Every structure is written in structure tokens, then in C-alpha cells.
Amino acid sequence: MSETNKIEPEPLNWLESGQLHHARWQSASGSALPKTVFVADDTLSASVAYKLVCEGTAILWRGDFHQGRQMVQSLARRIDKARDYKASKAKPQDIAPKDMYYAYRQAQAQRARVLGLVVVELAADYWLPLRRAPDMRVACTQAWGEPTDAGCIVSLRELMGVVAAYEWRKNGVTVPALAGLSDGKIHPYYGVFAPIRNEYVELVVKACQQRSAPIDTAFDI
């Protein structure tokens, strides 16, 4: 597609202090653009926030950075409590295993969507102008590429995932089965599945050791 015919993504619009604002919606998972936005700070209670996100309203966080993280954690606890209560009333014997699996996956997807509605605004250089916010510019650049000429709105939860991936990449993740090879660590990029199931690597190592003939074919499942 030529540059002249390129379709730009629809921006997120919201009212703040009586003025209309808009910014690019950043979502690595491709989550839908929120229809409504509520601008909030540290004075917002968790109960009101829970009601808003359950209705599909995005909360644009303008308060303290760490308070924003605590808000997401509080919402997660409320969602899990409601899920557990619903599960306690269900009758598992009446639900087929396949349906239980799909219901679980659906609940997890819904949980991610709701928690993703606590959002923040990043400046054009990926700077986060919140109190006590760390400098995330390098982490964002590694995950999303070089900054553009405009800011963006991103889920706080996704942003924390970007930072976690950056720390993994920088510090590495120790894998015992790789002892003796380089530093015994892997340095995954953003978007790589969490490399915490080290037992899988150990199984591969043992399988290779048990074969007398060389292995020239492998399957990544």
C-alpha cells in the first residue's frame, strides 16, 4: 500500500478540563479502542474504578505512578473475587471439560481487557509525566521502535510488561540447563513467551544426551 493510501489508525479522543484531546492508541495485543474515557487521579476509589472498567470505560490515570499500579492490582483482586464467587455457585459436574476450558479462557481474556482499561499518556519521546514514574524511554523504544512525532495512550498493564521485558533482556534469565554455555542465561526480546518453564529445556537436554545418533530435526511446539 502506498504512503498516500495508507490508513492511519483512529485516535483515542477524550475531554479534559473542558478541552478535546486526542492521541494515538498503542496496543500490542490489538485491543479495541475504548469508547469512553474518564480522567482520574489518586482521589478515585477502587469501587468507582471497578464500576467504570466493568462498563468498558477507560481510566486515564493522571495521579501518582505507584498509586496507579496499586489501582490495577486492586481491580485484579476484585475481578478474581467475583470470578471465584461465580465459580463457587456453579456445578462442575454439569459442565463438560471442553466447555470448562473455553469458559476459563474467556474469563482470562475478559480479565485482561478490563485491567487493560487503566491507561496512561506517554509523550512523543515515550516519557511518562506522572509523579514517581521511572524513565521507561529505552524500554519502550526496544519494544515499539523509535518514537514518533506524537504521544500515545497505552494500558498501564501493557507498559509494565514492556518494562519487565526490558529487564529480562538486560539482566538475562538463568536457565540451569545452559550452564557452561556463555553466561548460562537467555536474553529474550519483548514479545517472547515467558522463559520460566526451565524444566522443558532440561527435558530437551536429557533427550539429546540419550541419543547416540546426531539430531538434525526438531519441532518447536
Language-model features, listed with the residues they occupy:
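N-terminal auxiliary segments of SAM/dcSAM-dependent transferases
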Residues: 2-180
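Sensory/regulatory domains in signal-transduction proteins
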Residues: 173-175, 186, 192
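Conserved SAM/SAH cofactor-binding pocket of Class I
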Residues: 197-221
